[in-house]
Amino acid sequence: MPNQLPADSVGLVTPQTLHFSEPLELACGISLNEYDLVYETYGQLNAAKSNAVLICHALSGHHHAAGYHRLEDKRPGWWDAYIGPGKPIDTNKFFVVALNNLGGCHGSTGPRSINPATGNVWGADFPMLRVRDWVASQARLADALGIDTWAAIIGGSLGGMQVMRWSIQYPQRVRYAVVIASAMKLSAQNIAFNEAARKAIISDPNFHNGDYLAHNTLPKNGLAVARMIGHITYLSDYAMGEKFGRDLRSGSFELGIAEPVEFQIESYLRYQGDSFAVSFDANSYIRITKALDYFDLAREYSDDPVLAFQGAQAKFLVVSFSTDWRFAPQRSREIVDALVGANKAVTYAEIESKHGHDAFLLPDARYEQVFKRYLASVEV
């Protein structure tokens, strides 16, 4: 971190925890009798409580979206480029709420939490989740914060799925919906990538059918491979080629040299996998990717996406990125077509970017411009 906080930073922030004792019935039929949600806020809630913005995170995201926890932190929250004074999600204007979803591993109730019914860690017994469950818990968080209606709900990737679900599950509580690099349902290829990642986890001898904590071990190798698989899909071929090409980290192609060749991209992927394996939970990963797979916005509407959006009241911004092949621009155009068919107000932008799916997280002048101008139109 620099010697002083950047002028456009939200500054030092402290996570907060809310405990909920009213049971939450999940889509799977199981109820969580009590649970915690960890969240952060940036900016000030106005007297009318009309300026609140909810940030919905993606697979590996969490509540720390902006600012710093300590002056010693090496990097800010995961979306700091877009949240702060004068930034697209302007904290001089908006009161921003970011949370860690249920089933995660960054403080909200999840597989690593204690099951109050047994006194033991939930582990493999933690129930499977759906996107609608996250949205229901987020609505309860809004109630606890005194927020009847969100000025905007914003999310990328899996976060965008939550935004869409909000727009049809609680239509009267969302004024603007920003859906970034997302889809109304996963493709077969996406489901296949998720299953390959899960297979890597459950094949790790240290997984113990999900009860690894009871065995005082962690399936780090399996989780690392799962992250490597996922990370490949977040990058574009162009970006990988430009950054790494066929450059070597060690070894040589010269004849007569026995030392094994290691490419830079191999080293990079191993680093990403190993880092993730010590910061994330395998049971959380399995549940979150399953929620991704299960999501299908139109399923309960006779598979008609136009009908699914019929009751939505929000105005929409849909954003895609040209080299994103995990959630390709065509998937975003399908969202737009459904919204147009349902006669909803929608703005669409396809951003030229070389960074693939990860582009929604990274600084980009055009993306920032579109984002900023759209949110400037939101009246509070």
From Swiss-Prot:
Family as reported in the entry's similarity comment: Belongs to the AB hydrolase superfamily. MetX family.
Coiled coil: none
Principal location class: cytoplasm
Keyword Amino-acid biosynthesis assigned: yes
Pathway: Amino-acid biosynthesis; L-methionine biosynthesis via de novo pathway; O-succinyl-L-homoserine from L-homoserine: step 1/1
GO cellular component, one term: cytoplasm
Highest classification ranks of the organism: Bacteria, Pseudomonadati, Pseudomonadota, Gammaproteobacteria, Cellvibrionales
GO biological process, one term: homoserine metabolic process
Functional description taken from the UniProt entry: Transfers a succinyl group from succinyl-CoA to L-homoserine, forming succinyl-L-homoserine.
Reactions catalysed, as given in the entry: L-homoserine + succinyl-CoA = O-succinyl-L-homoserine + CoA
Binding site for substrate: 227, 358
GO molecular function list: homoserine O-acetyltransferase activity; homoserine O-succinyltransferase activity
Name by which UniProt lists this protein: Homoserine O-succinyltransferase
The EC number(s) this enzyme carries: 2.3.1.46
Gene it is expressed from: metXS
InterPro entries: AB_hydrolase_1 (IPR000073), AB_hydrolase_fold (IPR029058), HAT_MetX-like (IPR008220)
Residues of the site described as Important for acyl-CoA specificity: 326
Entry's localization field: Cytoplasm
